Amino acid sequence: MLKAFKEFAVKGNALDMAVGVILGASFGTIVKSLVDDLIMPPIGLVLGGVDFSNLFVTLRDGAAPGPYASLAAAKQAGAVTLNVGVFANTVVSFTIVAFAVFLLVRGVNTLRERLEGPAAPKQQACPFCFSKIDVRATRCPHCTATIG
C-alpha cells in the first residue's frame, strides 16, 4: 500500500496539482493585499474618504450601544452587522482572480491551438441543398442526396 501511495504521490499529476494548490493559495493572498491595500483605498478616497473595511450596517446593537467607530469595535461589543465593505472587497478580489484565471485559460488554449493546428471541420455543406451536415454523413438528412 505504501508503494502504491508513493507511485501516486510522485506521479506528475499529483505533484502538479499540489503545486497548483500552493500557488493558488499564495496568489489569493497577493490578490487580497492588492485589493485591500492598493485598489480599495483610492476608490474610498474618491467616494469621500470611505474605508471599505469599516463599511458596515448595524442590525442590532451589542452590549455597548452604537454607533461604533469601526467594524472591530462593533464586533467587540457583540453587535450584529452586515459587513458591506468586507463583501465589496471580496467581490473585487474574486473578480481579479476570475479575470486572471480567464487570461490563463485563454493563453493555454491559444498556445494549444498553435501547437496542434486548426481543428478538423465537423460539418460540411451539402453540395445539393447547401445545408450543414456532419462530415461523416453519406446522405443529406435535408434533401436525401447521396454525399460522395
UniProtKB/Swiss-Prot annotation:
It comes from the Bacteria. Pfam families: MscL (PF01741). It is found in: Cell inner membrane. Keywords: Cell inner membrane, Cell membrane, Ion channel, Ion transport, Membrane, Transmembrane, Transmembrane helix, Transport. The keyword Zinc does not apply. The chain crosses the membrane at residues 15-35, 84-104. The keyword Membrane applies. GO terms for molecular function: mechanosensitive monoatomic ion channel activity. One of its GO terms (cellular component) is plasma membrane. It is a multi-pass membrane protein. PANTHER family: LARGE-CONDUCTANCE MECHANOSENSITIVE CHANNEL, MECHANOSENSITIVE CHANNEL MSCL. Homopentamer. HAMAP family: MscL. Belongs to the MscL family. Channel that opens in response to stretch forces in the membrane lipid bilayer. May participate in the regulation of osmotic pressure changes within the cell. This is Large-conductance mechanosensitive channel. It comes from Nitratidesulfovibrio vulgaris (strain DSM 19637 / Miyazaki F). The gene is mscL.
